[in-house]
């Protein structure tokens, strides 16, 4: 069984200090998608969440799957007072027939203005 890596972030002048990661890794029939943050960092939690979820869709598509195949999601937000606004966008985006197991936590982001980051695991049929 091979491991397929997509969207490998390498060190360059504009992202110096960031980790070298693969945003999407597929092993067997499971895809792991991480480091999904707003880029550029603009707007409120709703704007950033919508931007991040569009990127999730892009990465899932790249791996040959979609949000109906999500198994789990981990969400980090900058402040729990943003939880309801984040969820309003999440609930519009998620496949209501196939919601993943999900956790939402708060964190201090290292990038100024960043309000949300998402990591998901999905089946890859």
Can you say where each PLM-predicted feature lies in the sequence?
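N-terminal presequence-like segments and the immediate start of the first folded domain
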Residues: 1-71, 77-125
């Amino acid at each position: 069984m091979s491991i397929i890596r997509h969207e490998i972030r390498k060190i360059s002048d504009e992202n110096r200090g960031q980790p070298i990661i693969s945003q999407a890794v597929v092993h067997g029939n499971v895809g792991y998608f991480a480091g999904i943050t707003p880029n550029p960092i603009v707007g409120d939690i709703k704007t950033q969440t919508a931007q991040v979820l569009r990127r999730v869709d892009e990465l899932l598509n790249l791996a040959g799957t979609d949000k109906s195949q999500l198994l789990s999601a981990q969400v980090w937000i900058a402040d729990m007072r943003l939880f309801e606004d984040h969820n309003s966008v999440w609930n519009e985006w998620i496949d209501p027939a196939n919601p993943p197991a999900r956790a939402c936590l708060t964190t201090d982001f290292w990038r100024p203005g960043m309000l949300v980051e998402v990591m998901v695991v999905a089946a890859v049929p």
